[in-house]
């Protein structure tokens, strides 16, 4: 690896599985000290800490929907590593339903995690980033923040809002050294997606069907999202701010599907 994050300190929320784990691993490989996070303290979290190295990683249990918990996460990171250079707001949840069938509880929880969770993270780290005059925040949005699929309400509403918040914060603090960007993944093969395939009557047929929908005829990998997060978080992207990058194999640009 090129050690593009040598000397940097990163917080990655929702980092014990899937895209978040791939980002945490890549950042650590590039020299960063990484604070891992999950809303549950399980064996996976401890195993990942051991993998990354206890001297260069920290695990903080926190629900991103809890503002006080996120402030504690930021404070513990600064106490341990002295600063925060990078925040990856990756933690999220899928809530897919028909609008009038959606429960009030699911509506509130979707926004609490997918939108307010990212704001809680940003609000917790921005004071220290502003004090040091530099910082990069990357929000993991979704292709659902660009295209609407029936039956997926209210997830796309939250992700559209997250992209809007990305742009607003990026503009608000650009002159003070802060960059805020987002990434919108399409279908990325994580453990959650593998479980979806496994639950289908013909898992391989469903996998092939999904791949056939993409111009490149293959599904995405978590490591590909991690590579983009690395670029946006690093000093290689100093003039990229308040924007969103789609990682969906080109599917969102197709007129017909």
Model regions: which residues?
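Conserved glycine-rich cofactor-binding loop
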Residues: 9, 16-17
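Conserved glycine-rich Rossmann-like NAD(P)H-binding loop of the short-chain dehydrogenase/reductase
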Residues: 30-46
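Substrate-binding pocket helix/loop in short-chain dehydrogenase/reductase
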Residues: 98-99, 103-111, 210
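Active-site helix of classical SDR
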Residues: 122, 158, 166
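Alpha-helical segment proximal to the catalytic Tyr-Lys
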Residues: 127, 171-175, 238
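Residue(s) in the substrate-gating loop at a strand-loop-helix junction
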Residues: 142
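Short C-terminal tail/terminal secondary-structure segment
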Residues: 147, 230, 241-257
């Amino acid at each position: 690896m090129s050690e593009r994050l040598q000397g940097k300190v990163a917080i990655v929320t929702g980092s014990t599985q899937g895209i978040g784990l791939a980002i945490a691993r890549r950042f650590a490989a590039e020299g960063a000290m990484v604070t891992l996070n999950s809303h549950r303290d399980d064996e996976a979290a401890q195993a990942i800490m051991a993998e990354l190295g206890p001297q260069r990683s920290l695990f903080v249990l926190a629900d991103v929907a809890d503002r006080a918990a996120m402030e504690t996460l930021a404070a513990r990171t600064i106490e341990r590593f002295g600063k925060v250079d990078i925040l990856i707001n990756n933690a999220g949840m899928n809530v897919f339903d028909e609008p009038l069938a959606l429960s009030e509880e699911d509506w509130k929880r979707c926004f609490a995690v997918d939108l307010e969770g990212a704001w809680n993270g940003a609000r917790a780290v921005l004071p220290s980033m502003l004090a040091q005059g530099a910082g990069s925040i990357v929000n993991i949005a979704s292709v659902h923040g660009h295209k609407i699929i029936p039956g997926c309400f209210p997830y796309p509403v939250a992700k559209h809002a997250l992209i809007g918040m990305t742009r607003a914060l990026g503009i608000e603090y650009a002159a003070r050294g802060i960059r805020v960007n987002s990434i919108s993944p399409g279908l990325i093969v994580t453990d959650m997606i593998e479980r979806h395939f496994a639950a289908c009557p013909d898992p391989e047929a469903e996998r092939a069907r999904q791949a056939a929908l993409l111009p490149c005829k293959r599904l995405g990998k978590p490591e590909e999202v991690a590579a983009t997060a690395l670029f946006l978080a690093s000093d290689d992207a100093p003039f990229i701010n308040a924007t969103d990058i789609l990682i969906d194999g080109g599917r969102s640009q197709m007129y017909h599907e």
